[in-house]
Structure formats: structure tokens, C-alpha cells
From Swiss-Prot:
This is SsrA-binding protein. The gene is smpB. Its main location: cytoplasm. It comes from Flavobacterium psychrophilum (strain ATCC 49511 / DSM 21280 / CIP 103535 / JIP02/86). NCBIfam families: PRK05422.1, smpB. It is found in: Cytoplasm. Required for rescue of stalled ribosomes mediated by trans-translation. Binds to transfer-messenger RNA (tmRNA), required for stable association of tmRNA with ribosomes. tmRNA and SmpB together mimic tRNA shape, replacing the anticodon stem-loop with SmpB. tmRNA is encoded by the ssrA gene; the 2 termini fold to resemble tRNA(Ala) and it encodes a 'tag peptide', a short internal open reading frame. During trans-translation Ala-aminoacylated tmRNA acts like a tRNA, entering the A-site of stalled ribosomes, displacing the stalled mRNA. GO terms for cellular component: cytosol. SUPFAM superfamilies: Small protein B (SmpB). Belongs to the SmpB family. Keywords: Cytoplasm, RNA-binding. One of its GO terms (biological process) is trans-translation. It comes from the Bacteria. The lineage of its organism: Bacteria, Pseudomonadati, Bacteroidota, Flavobacteriia, Flavobacteriales. GO terms for molecular function: RNA binding.
């Protein structure tokens, strides 16, 4: 049984309003998948962008594999995402017409050891929206604390 890896983009839910979620496969080299299985990746500042009809994740950081030597990959290269044609067309339409953004939420390996990326169609939050999120979270925490006392 393979150990599953789960790398999160923790700021995504705070900075964006998530509209829709998708799970995409990734085109990776051998040293990239080995680094991901070791948990040496970061998707905190990454985003997705269309180049033609294909979707790429940009600015994701996958550390070089320690034993890769001359065949190692570039840590910040663009990586192609694999989705159904129908899903790609829908995402492209939403990004072009509605001005939405696609960001990665989670990088993980499934039970077969394949690397997958959970992406989300999002709308950026304004500063006052972020303040509301903080207030709501604090109010919920206070209510839970009061309920626990009784």
C-alpha cells in the first residue's frame, strides 16, 4: 500500500470565493513524481492558465529530487493538467466571459500513486469580504464556546 500525500493551498479559501471544483491529472516527469511522493512540493502561490486549448498550472514549486542528478527537473516549470474536453471548454468559457480565476486547492496522490490536483473556479475576494469572513469565523467560534459551557 502506498502512502498518500496531501499538500494544501491554505490561503485559497481566505483569498477567493470558490464557485466550482474539479480534479485534474498532471503530466509529470519521473523525478517530479518522486519529489511529490516525498511531500516536497508547494502550491501556495500557483495559479492555472490556458495556453491555447490546454490548461497549465504555473508557479507551482516541486523541489528537485535528491537522487535525480543530471535528469532532474526545473522546480518552477509549467505543468500540463489533464481534464475532459467538456470540462476544459466550460472552464475556458467561464474564465473568458465571467473573469474568474482557476487556482489549485490540493495536490495529492491517489491509491494508485498517481499525482492529482484539485482545482477550483474562483472569484477573488475584496478586503471587506475577507474581514467579513474573519468576523463570521470568530462569531462561530464564540457560539461554539458558549454552547460547550451549557
Amino acid at each position: 500500500m502506498l502512502k498518500t500525500v496531501n499538500i494544501l493551498n491554505k490561503r485559497a479559501k481566505f483569498e477567493y470565493e470558490i464557485i466550482d471544483r474539479y480534479t485534474a491529472g498532471m503530466v509529470l516527469t519521473g523525478t517530479e513524481i518522486k519529489s511529490i511522493r516525498l511531500g516536497k512540493a508547494n502550491i501556495a502561490e500557483s495559479f492555472c492558465e490556458f495556453q491555447g486549448d490546454e490548461l497549465f498550472v504555473i508557479n507551482s514549486h516541486i523541489e528537485e529530487y535528491l537522487f535525480g542528478h543530471q535528469y532532474n527537473h526545473k522546480p518552477k516549470s509549467e505543468r500540463k493538467l489533464l481534464l475532459n474536453k467538456r470540462e476544459l471548454k466550460g472552464l475556458l468559457k467561464d474564465v473568458q466571459n465571467k473573469g474568474l480565476t482557476i487556482i489549485p486547492l490540493r495536490l495529492f496522490t491517489n491509491e494508485k500513486g498517481m499525482a492529482k490536483l484539485d482545482i477550483a473556479l474562483c472569484k477573488g475576494k475584496k478586503t471587506f469580504d475577507k474581514r467579513e469572513t474573519i468576523k463570521d469565523r470568530d462569531n462561530k467560534r464564540d457560539l461554539d464556546r458558549i454552547k460547550k459551557e451549557f
